[in-house]
């Protein structure tokens, strides 16, 4: 089945968290843990070599600068002001330069994070409701929870405590962004 699995008498679905927000809030994790249903949250965190992270960010800045030049050329050909570039391009360029500065001067390190959410329920309907509830929690914190279509088995294997991540949908975070996550016992 495309977006769920069945194991014994339980139905399950694994989703990944697409982190759109610039930082990850530990309050979101607490909200997931406070949910009154069968939910398992998995964080796979991989450290990146410091020099490699700097090289990667420099390449990204070069790519963004190249895209900016192409946009400026298009604007000139179309008779527009060349200083007007798409806002996303300007935003990403600024963020990449800030990230490079942080890596070079603030002793920040770079990490890759995969955050998976496993929902379990007794019926398909209850599973769908619980996945919907988990997606609402993610949305509250400017994140998107997306089911792993056709990759439920890999998601399940990545959710059991073997330390193996078979889902390589990752988001780069710095030390300070990652340190905002305080794993603790949920409050009841």
Region locations from a protein language model:
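Residue-level detector of conserved catalytic or cofactor/ligand-binding positions
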Residues: 179-187
């Amino acid at each position: 089945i495309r977006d769920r699995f069945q194991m014994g008498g339980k139905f399950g679905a694994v989703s990944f968290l697409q982190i759109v927000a610039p930082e990850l809030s530990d309050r979101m994790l607490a909200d997931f843990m406070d949910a009154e249903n069968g939910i398992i949250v998995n964080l796979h965190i991989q450290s990146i070599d410091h020099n490699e992270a700097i090289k990667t960010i420099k390449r990204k800045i070069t790519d963004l600068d190249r895209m900016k030049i192409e946009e400026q050329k298009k604007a000139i050909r179309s008779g527009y002001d060349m200083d007007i570039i798409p806002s996303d391009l300007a935003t990403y360029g600024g963020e990449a330069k800030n990230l490079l500065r942080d890596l070079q001067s603030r002793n920040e390190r770079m990490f890759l994070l995969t955050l998976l959410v496993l929902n379990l329920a007794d019926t398909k309907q209850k599973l769908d409701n619980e996945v919907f509830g988990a997606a609402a929690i993610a949305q509250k914190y400017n994140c998107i929870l997306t089911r792993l279509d056709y990759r439920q088995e890999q998601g399940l294997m990545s959710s059991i405590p073997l330390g193996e991540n078979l889902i390589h949908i990752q988001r780069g975070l710095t030390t300070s962004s990652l340190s905002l996550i305080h794993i603790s016992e949920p409050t009841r």
